[in-house]
Amino acid sequence: MAMSNGNNDFVVLSNSSIATSAANPSPLTPCDGDHAAQQLTPKEATRTKVSPNGCLQLNGTVKSSFLPLDNQRMPQMLPQCCHPCPYHHPLTSHSSHQECHPEAGPAAPSALASCCMQPHSEYSASLCPNHSPVYQTTCCLQPSPSFCLHHPWPDHFQHQPVQQHIANIRPSRPFKLPKSYAALIADWPVVVLGMCTMFIVVCALVGVLVPELPDFSDPLLGFEPRGTAIGQRLVTWNNMVKNTGYKATLANYPFKYADEQAKSHRDDRWSDDHYEREKREVDWNFHKDSFFCDVPSDRYSRVVFTSSGGETLWNLPAIKSMCNVDNSRIRSHPQFGDLCQRTTAASCCPSWTLGNYIAILNNRSSCQKIVERDVSHTLKLLRTCAKHYQNGTLGPDCWDMAARRKDQLKCTNVPRKCTKYNAVYQILHYLVDKDFMTPKTADYATPALKYSMLFSPTEKGESMMNIYLDNFENWNSSDGVTTITGIEFGIKHSLFQDYLLMDTVYPAIAIVIVLLVMCVYTKSMFITLMTMFAIISSLIVSYFLYRVVFHFEFFPFMNLTALIILVGIGADDAFVLCDVWNYTKFDKPHAETSETVSITLQHAALSMFVTSFTTAAAFYANYVSNITAIRCFGVYAGTAILVNYVLMVTWLPAVVVLHERYLLNIFTCFKKPQQQIYDNKSCWTVACQKCHKVLFAISEASRIFFEKVLPCIVIKFRYLWLFWFLALTVGGAYIVCINPKMKLPSLELSEFQVFRSSHPFERYDAEYKKLFMFERVHHGEELHMPITVIWGVSPEDNGNPLNPKSKGKLTLDSSFNIASPASQAWILHFCQKLRNQTFFYQTDEQDFTSCFIETFKQWMENQDCDEPALYPCCSHWSFPYKQEIFELCIKRAIMELERSTGYHLDSKTPGPRFDINDTIRAVVLEFQSTYLFTLAYEKMHQFYKEVDSWISSELSSAPEGLSNGWFVSNLEFYDLQDSLSDGTLIAMGLSVAVAFSVMLLTTWNIIISLYAIISIAGTIFVTVGSLVLLGWELNVLESVTISVAVGLSVDFAVHYGVAYRLAPDPDREGKVIFSLSRVGSAMAMAALTTFVAGAMMMPSTVLAYTQLGTFMMLIMCISWAFATFFFQCMCRCLGPQGTCGQIPLPKKLQCSAFSHALSTSPSDKGQSKTHTINAYHLDPRGPKSELEHEFYELEPLASHSCTAPEKTTYEETHICSEFFNSQAKNLGMPVHAAYNSELSKSTESDAGSALLQPPLEQHTVCHFFSLNQRCSCPDAYKHLNYGPHSCQQMGDCLCHQCSPTTSSFVQIQNGVAPLKATHQAVEGFVHPITHIHHCPCLQGRVKPAGMQNSLPRNFFLHPVQHIQAQEKIGKTNVHSLQRSIEEHLPKMAEPSSFVCRSTGSLLKTCCDPENKQRELCKNRDVSNLESSGGTENKAGGKVELSLSQTDASVNSEHFNQNEPKVLFNHLMGEAGCRSCPNNSQSCGRIVRVKCNSVDCQMPNMEANVPAVLTHSELSGESLLIKTL
């Protein structure tokens, strides 16, 4: 090791790092390797290891960089490294302090032990007592008086036997409580994981064992509004119906009569039970001579046929095909004989099919016997009779089946042939679609029969399940002639529960794919599996909270879809946390684990909380809905997301710490390639290497895309993006709000869609019910809407609105009184006024029950008072009657009504309701309205508003006993539609408000929050507009997904907004580039995983899965595009700068993540040292002037007008100015002048002051490459005192023998270097440098803000006094620096000054493999460089270095002693390999590096950061660093 001991000197460590004394001006006292090692405490010493190539890892792990493979390393085996190096003289300082490394003597031990396994500290161990802590990479076991530079750095360790894994042995220490939560995670990760696991297991057991398991047998349960005005009335009315009967709360009859008639009259004649019993006990009208057993009806199973080729079904092959399908698919099933209706024990009834009707009309024995003539004859018959059917004269009972002739009393105007067997009516009514014989098509030669129905003589219901599963589920539904497109077996909801569980395989597939993506991204199967376990556990714990803690008894099937959403969100959080962990590890590699955890959680916990809270809030916002299932789903999903967040800040950090400490590189394939070099070339090894190569190539391409290409695309075309996305937003708003609009559901609740639209069950309900006349009539489309007015019962829903089975109890109105004369007169007048309204429908039939007071008054007037038995209920009394007369006579009138008319009163019959004391407690009036029942929302809305407003106005004048009346009708579906439309808008608005609030609280910036909300609004409009175009209707599932859109779309905008605020750059463009490069890849991965999770849902049969999958794919693509292009472009054009839009807050209230950014103004940002403290950003770029705003790293790619000189001069201006201003003083080089670029010719004087204000305390330094060449000159090593004339000393320290030979080339010692995709060259001359090393431990993505890119701080300055050259590696080309670069140097006007100058090109050394003739290739023209006198910006000062020579040229063959020998290679990016102009010679590459921090902040371990590969096979032998 070489160490300086001056205040303004630097220390060159064996890991290539430089520890300047700028941060700590205390002098550096001499120390050798042993001394440094002795300073390590036992705790520090036991927790570290050294890797095979000299990089130490923390926490007991070995991490090494990728080295060349066997065929790429140097062919000759190098001698043992650790021996005394007699030529190595340590550097000295201009001060008189003792040297750190005395000159080696004969008895001195080896410079570096071959198996240097001395552990180094995880903490910042000071090498010398009076020097600031540095990152000590290697410490030999023996004293190291000198450092041997005879051997290239990688091979120095490469050939040494190294123990691959060293267990982490912690010394025993007394127990002490952790000081913080981060310390708890870092020191006790197993305890944290154990506690979390125990809690999860307990929750799982209690959640499963205590409450009943959910029942999904009725998928429609909970799909009803609760708490709305209509909903409360409907619930009350249903409760009233259920509580009306014998010994119930209410009764239609007085109690003394009810007891006698209870057994025969207590059943509801219209109840489902009655209907089912009637259905079971039906007497089949079997006649010996009849062909069919019965009339087809709704209770039979049926299927719908259509032609496979699109032709008409009215042809002989199609008709026979339908018969064959019936026989082969239904009647041949083993269970059919047990299910079918029979005329005799021997055979089942025939099916009602078109072929059988044609057979009976033409006296054929069966469908198979009919011929073409029969088909034509039947068609002619239908043409003749269709008009009679259409005008209503041909009815269902025109044929007398008993007499086998036409009924003489009916259908007198219908020809006999049209009534035969009622066949024509049944064909037109049941078997063919309604468009078959319309007047328009009656004249066609062959009317088009598109659809035909087939009725099977089996009742629909559960009994048909096996027939469907065996013969229909997996059949393609076609025999080549006809196709079954619709099925109605009555098993849709029963089958749904089975499919709901079966289709969970698709979320499982999605989880597996997301696992693979996460594994590739995190490079850790352990972290991936633990993350997925946390996601599953979130659902388990959420179920426990939902059922046990929150006491939710109802668990709708929609809750299962939360798994899909959580998989995407959980993966997002894992990506964010792992990303921030890696940044933190790189930012502060020498930090303790607890500090790393603390910094990671400081940002990641905040970022994850914002996204989790906004998404959870969007789910919780659904609680404002009135629909039970939506409310329950919102609570469950929101709770699951919050539980997932808690696990992500407890479980996942502990998992990462555990992985870092014990599990890193535990599997062979996950080791780095250099660890496998000496293994046998097994198939497993080769496969792993290939896998690494592929992953590396992909990740490198993605890194370049997100850090360079994407910012370039976003910024350069920002106005185009703004215009395009604004146009999309306007178009989406037009589609959603104006035309075609989001339609409300068009299917009744009983037909609610649960399978995908192409399923035959759904097609029957959605399409074919409307096409057959019997369904249209049965469906109730011709039924008039009733107007039911109720008094005496309060319209209150006092049940549990979160449990659809809890409807509460009936609440009677204590103020109700109808017996008073005033009430009698008012209610009679009310009935009379209602009959005069336009919405009242007058029927021809006599109405006894609509308005009971009218019937009662008439009955009283007809009673003769001469009969004593009738008194007092007779005509003697005039209306209104006395209260006691009314109460007595109303009971008698009701009993007389049934006795005289036989009219039975049921629970739904209008009239008075009595309690057990025969007191009238309620009254029901019912009238028919002119409005017909429809599913159209507008018509039902008009009906409800008109009737309700009229009744409310009338009730305002009612007497006190009748003032609390209310009206109800068949409004269940209308209420559902109304609740969906209103609730969805309210939930979305609430979600947007919460998102805005959270954004505001997170960023404290109104402008960014506003931009985020605008981006979210655009996302919502485009997404919902797309769903409208896909044919979505706003049903229950759709309402949930759309309201959740806000929560899912806010994530990306939040992440970008937070990153924008955290950006250290003062200008908009820098902030945008920072946010894109810092979180862009994580956001894309998050979108990808959620998109994949949604895509995997698409094959599902259950509609809930497919719709959620469609929605998730749309929302991910659209929200990512809006956040990346629209939101970022808004920030680039009108984004806040400095404190613009910032809410002023006391420092104590500011989030720690923003405290430094808020407190640092653009003017002092460069001086602030707090930027490196925060884990989210590294070195700030320093203040920039406006001229820089349009320049960034891919300028040539973004604009053809941007020339190479402009770009390179811009970059060198910034780089060199930052280097010299911030580091020259530290290195003993006074800053006499500032470097000025050619760019200043066009931009003139703006640049100087701004460009030359680098952050002095950021310790940024330009890192260099040098020519590594063997030096055999004993006098090559001299002590240099760095001062104003350090370059003069350098002239004396180099010999001719150290000059480049034909085999010399620019080499990076461990073969790893970061590359960038652009060609930028910055060269300068400073003090002597030679032995440049890249830290082999570099793992992780690094994105210093300095130049809007991600270069690791891993190239370090080594002022060693010889230039080494390494022999060619393997069969790679020989590189040499051949041509003089004299032309690229400024002609100095005075000997003591020179400036940084850019060649404007990337130099490539080429070598002819045959004659070793060396040439120099150039990528760009270098003619743009001029002398320093005429091209420099007058506004800035010059950066000068004192030289003692006037000759500033470099000889092409030798480095003369009178010449400056430092090549400032400040190269940024990857140089592509090109051939030399005149011969086919391979070109080497000079690798570009950047200015960066001097404190050698290298990662001390690999924190599941993707690995670094350097193989010549990759990217044309490119040297790249993996940062994705």
UniProtKB/Swiss-Prot annotation:
Disulphide bond pairs: none
Domain SSD, chain residue ranges per copy: 486-658
GO biological process: determination of left/right symmetry; diaphragm development; dorsal/ventral pattern formation; embryonic pattern specification; patched ligand maturation; peptide transport; protein homotrimerization; regulation of protein secretion
Glycosylation sites: N59, N582
One GO cellular component term: membrane
GO molecular function, one term: molecular carrier activity
Location (main, coarse): membrane
Transmembrane stretches, start-end: 190-210, 500-520, 525-545, 549-569, 604-624, 638-658, 719-739, 988-1008, 1010-1030, 1040-1060, 1079-1099, 1107-1127
Subunit-structure text: Interacts with SHH via the cholesterol anchor of the dually lipid-modified SHH (ShhNp).
Annotated protein name in UniProt: Protein dispatched homolog 1
